[in-house]
Amino acid sequence: MTLTSRGPRPVRAIVYGVGEMGSIVTRLLVERGVEIAGAIGRSTTKVGRDLGEVAGLGRRLGIPVEADAAAVLGRGADIAIVCVGSYLETMFPHFAACLENGINVVTIEEETVFPWTSAPARAQ
């Protein structure tokens, strides 16, 4: 099954965070035919390496993990899958950067499911 956006082209996604969860997300995106437009990470052991290697795919994807989030987001995508934290208050700047670049946000962060109890000001 290939995920597509409006029209005949595949969804373009940015993997924002390349730890364990970002690696799982990468594998799922590749399996489903999503076009990976970029990868953002901060670990010095991962930045500069190929996303396929970092995610344990056993092959290169031709997508380098980059530390400069603004540069990656500035190149555009349909969505960013944000996998870099657990709390809305600390995640908000990452979400805002995506949205400011016209990129929709998908996240695994648990607090975003029902933020009204833990981050009511941000939930508004």
Which ranges hold each PLM region?
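A short hydrophobic/small-residue beta-strand
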Residues: N104-V106
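Rossmann-fold NAD(P)-binding glycine/threonine-rich loop
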Residues: T90-F92, A96-A97, E109-Q124
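A secondary-structure boundary/capping signal
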Residues: G17, I108-E109
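N-terminal glycine-/serine-/threonine-rich beta1-alpha1-beta2 phosphate-ribose binding loop
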Residues: M1-N101
